[in-house]
């Protein structure tokens, strides 16, 4: 009986670890932020225009947050 209980406990622990690793599958991969969806790329490299176009690190200036037309 003790062996069965230990086996079930190990199985439950294994399933918990597997489900915890699956939880990270919803997040976009790092390469998707740089190359994938263009809106994600804009969000990552946008610059508000109140900086008067003085954007750092080659960012683009967007008048309406990150989704507006490039200035």
Curated annotation (Swiss-Prot):
One of its GO terms (molecular function) is sodium channel inhibitor activity. Its main location: secreted. Disulfide bonds join 46-61, 47-55, 49-66. Pfam families: ATX_III. One of its GO terms (cellular component) is extracellular region. Residues 1-20 form the signal peptide. The keyword Disulfide bond applies. Residues 21-41 form a propeptide. It is found in: Secreted; Nematocyst. Keywords: Disulfide bond, Ion channel impairing toxin, Nematocyst, Neurotoxin, Secreted, Signal, Toxin, Voltage-gated sodium channel impairing toxin. The keyword Lipid biosynthesis does not apply. Belongs to the sea anemone short toxin (type III) family. Voltage-gated sodium channel (Nav) inhibitor. 1 uM completely inhibits insect voltage-gated sodium channel inactivation (DmNav1 from D.melanogaster). This is Delta-actitoxin-Avd2b 2. It comes from Anemonia viridis (Snakelocks anemone).
